[in-house]
Amino acid sequence: MSKILFALFSLFTLVACGDTADKPTPHPQQAAPQLALSYQGKVYASGSTIDIAAIEHNFGDDTNFMEVKAGDESSPIVVFNPEAKGESSTLSSPLRYTATVTATDFSRFLWCGIEPQCKPLSQTTEIRHGELSAGKQNSPLLLECSFAPQQYTTVTATLHLQATSEKLPAVYTLRYVYAKP
């Protein structure tokens, strides 16, 4: 009798609780961020890593007259994300956002985009506020990274773009690469 009760109890538990071992738990689909980053004609999804090559500018025959920068001539651009669900492809009202840059080697960076003034980064994390609208559908990031001539290295910065109405930002890793030719 106890074996029958145990079997019935086991069957009841299986039916009542369900067997979820093989079934994935459904998660609500997260909407695509309203903002994205475009670089050299390609729009990148949140989570992407973007490589930005450094360019040597020679002002003479000597390395003493050389400047090496990345991000000054060819800069990523903040754009309205074409993948954003529930949004039209054009901006009918202004889209305000926050751009946050984090860089451990912050002294190498000069930030000239999003807001009108150029300023060197003075701390590990810097924040700027911008706006996209029907009349201004993109905004150059203009985050420049300087290198010492012939000191080949890669410097990384993280960019968070978050529209005012969003809970989660779009996140990008920007790798500024000064490679030996």
Task: Walk through the language-model features, giving the residues of each.
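Surface-exposed binding patches on compact interaction domains or structured appendages
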Residues: E87-Q137
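C-terminal edge beta-strand
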Residues: A170-K180
